[in-house]
Amino acid sequence: MSILEKDLTVKKATREAFGDEIVKLGKENKNIYVIDVDIAKSCKTVNFIKQLPDQHINVGIAEQNAAGLAAGLATTGKIPFVSTYAVFGSLRMLEQIRQEVCYPNLNVKIACSHGGLTPANDGGSHQAIEDMGVLRSVPNMTVIMGADYYSTRKLVEQAAKVYGPVYLRFTRDTVPMIYDENEEFTIGKVKKIKNGSDIAIIANGDTVRLALEATKELEKQGISVKLLDMHTIKPLDREAVVDCLNIGKIITVEDHNILNGLGSAVCEVVAEEGKGIVRRIGVQDQFGQSAPYEKLLELNGITVENIIKTAKELI
């Protein structure tokens, strides 16, 4: 069965994927540690604490201390995963990530739930709309967001094996199970969902499911879509973007500020490598508000309908 034919009603949050995978990895490698900031239940590390208590440290509500502790552990050969919310893991900890983790290029992983607008009713203060953009500008940092449960598990596994700082972003809400358990993923290499010739759609994270639904409808209307899951925005798969220039019309879709996120990363390659038209769908350079998640997406035009409309305008 192709991905376009899959039942997308079966859902699971990608933060749950992290919680399940980190237990597996911790049992396989005693050097893997989880550092919590008193929100283990929300970040799905409770099972890790129960099963591997000697590999867990809770620093309390002290994210900056967590980053410094992780850096210290990394110098002793440990592989620490700092687990927190995306808005804190990218901004509250930023100075420590830059100076203590990325500058010395230490093997620290920042694993963050509640990415993008998914905190929803918690309001704009808790919605990380700039996290991936901020951290992709820091040297040595890898930036990743899986689209669903299984892709996230595979990417967490790879993050544990690759040396260096990695930022992993997860959803708070449940998302459709797009991929099968046996699908393979490689950090820095796009996941091609479908080939096409009229327009290219590049999405990541939760917006892959929206791009998938839009693709189905566009195909019904005779528009051939190339659909890519760009789970890694740094290092970006430049070759995959350049290949889209054969089509020349690209739409990017992300639950992130359109400035300095996936859309900007794609535009950089297009500007450097050839001619093409790019339309960015994402958070419209504005703070969020307290509202249901789907309503926040709608307010920013991050919808199936807007993807279809934008595609037709380009064609």
Q: Predicted segments — roles?
A:
Residues 1-169, 174, 184, ...:
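Thiamine diphosphate
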